[in-house]
A protein has these predicted regions:
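Non-catalytic, mobile gating and regulatory segments of ester bond hydrolases
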Residues: 1-247
Length: 247
């Protein structure tokens, strides 16, 4: 069992209007989403899932089973929400993080699920289903992800790619263990896509008995890192009903 899988939020539950938990894409960690703290509404309690084997848990074994990882995150999240269980809960996941967020939503009832650059279960291609990437493919994927956050000097980029490639490889193996839930959620699901991403923008209508919306924003598969303000603006728009009408 893994522990300390969630970052420490800066806003206390008592002062918050919404509990937002974000799940990064494969191969990354919390660093790519920390900047959201500066642009999210001040009364949103923001937490990032910190997966094993990277950042503060560097050297820890990687997670090998997505369902068990979702169990561990859900247990920690339930404990954190125990004193304020009625605070609206929203789970956000980027790419692989969207599938992990979906599994957690089946374990901890959420008020909304937002997935980014993540096709619905059953519409994922072979690469999305955990096919191992060769050395060159891994390097291209990692370089694209890192450059989406900010431009990096070529020499430093090579070093960062070398450090990050094993994380992405482990996450691709983790993705291969994903099994789609057999029952739908009861919360709304918003699916966000980049207009430069080859993924076909489709709603997650089969995964919920509630509303399922699909929106296309400007950017590549890594539009979450490329245009964080646009993503946060879209979150504010789609989550207005969850916050009782407050934008």
């Amino acid at each position: 069992m893994f522990d300390k899988l969630l970052s420490t939020p800066l806003v206390t539950a008592a002062a918050a209007s919404l509990d937002l938990v974000a799940f990064p894409c494969a191969g990354s960690g919390s660093a790519g989403l920390r900047g959201w703290r500066e642009i999210l509404p001040a009364d949103w309690r923001f937490t990032i899932a910190c997966l094993p084997g990277r950042e503060t848990s560097y050297g820890q074994p990687f997670a090998r089973d997505m369902a068990r990882l979702a169990d561990d995150i859900a247990q920690e999240l339930r404990g954190r929400r125990a004193q304020h269980p009625d605070l609206p809960l929203v789970l956000f996941g980027h790419s692989m993080g969207g599938l992990l967020a979906q599994l957690v939503a089946h374990r901890v009832p959420a008020d909304a699920l937002v997935v980014a650059a993540c096709p619905p279960p059953g519409r994922r291609d072979a690469e999305d289903d955990g096919r191992p990437l060769d050395h060159d493919e891994l390097r291209r994927e990692v370089a694209g992800m890192l450059q989406a956050v900010s431009p990096i000097e070529p020499g430093l980029l090579d070093e960062l790619v070398g450090l990050t490639a094993p994380v992405l490889a482990a996450d691709i193996e983790l993705l291969a263990t994903y099994r789609a839930p057999t029952t739908p959620l009861s919360c709304g699901i918003w699916a966000l896509y980049g207009d430069g991403d080859p993924i076909e923008p489709l709603p997650w209508a089969a995964e919920t008995t509630a509303a399922a919306e699909c929106r296309v924003l400007s950017g590549s598969h890594f539009f979450v890192q490329e245009s964080p303000r646009a993503v946060v603006a879209e979150l504010r728009r789609c989550l207005t009903p969850v916050r009782g009408g407050k934008a």
